[in-house]
Design a protein with these regions (language model features):
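Glycine-rich beta-alpha loop elements in corrinoid/cobalamin-binding modules
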Residues: 1-115, 119-125
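Functional transmembrane helices that embed catalytic/metal-coordinating motifs
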Residues: 28, 168-169
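N-terminal [4Fe-4S]-dependent radical SAM core
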Residues: 96-167
Length: 169
């Protein structure tokens, strides 16, 4: 998941700290958390003609900008990738700050520097209100695997979860 790799992260396969997937993929924006309202807001801005590179104030998003830009939200912590990849203590401290800023009420923006670029994670999007959540679950979901799996006999693992209910989000 891109959201798990939105900051500098340890890669067990390579046995090293890698850059944010947003830097390596050269994507325009990354979303994290429950995406219903995030995507709705991004779509509304795109519909108004706002270029994707200018969408930098939506909560629950991560974007790259110039190193000297000013984030739209109060910043709780900022680190340089080149230091994070070589200093285990700093990496652990950064992770702690990231962890403490996952709450949509108290969470603040976070920053990582990559050469002349700045990666900004906006604070998390607030959870859906009851009416919004009801609307999501009222959508006409098929509640079955995609038909492309039918030719291979379906998805055996679906039997474990087909009668499950959402406990929390």
């Amino acid at each position: 998941e891109a959201s798990l790799r939105r900051f500098a992260h340890y890669d067990y396969w390579d046995d090293k700290v890698r850059r944010s997937i947003l830097v390596d993929s050269r994507a325009d924006i990354l979303t994290y958390g429950m995406g219903e309202n995030i995507l709705r807001r991004i779509a509304a801005l795109l519909d108004k003609g706002v270029p994707i590179k200018k969408i930098q104030d939506v909560r629950g998003t991560v974007y790259l900008t110039s190193r000297d830009a000013k984030p739209h939200y109060e910043v709780a912590g900022a680190w340089d990738y080149d230091e994070l990849k070589t200093d285990k203590r700093l990496y652990a401290e950064a992770f702690g700050v990231q962890y403490r800023n996952t709450d949509s009420i108290t969470g603040k923006a976070l920053v990582e520097y990559y050469d002349n670029k700045m990666l900004v994670q906006n604070p998390p999007m607030p959870p859906l209100e009851r009416e919004e959540l009801d609307a999501v679950y009222a959508l006409p979901y098929m509640r079955r695997p995609h038909p492309c799996y039918d030719k291979d006999g379906g998805v055996p693992a679906i039997a474990e979860v087909e009668m499950s209910i959402t406990h929390n989000r």
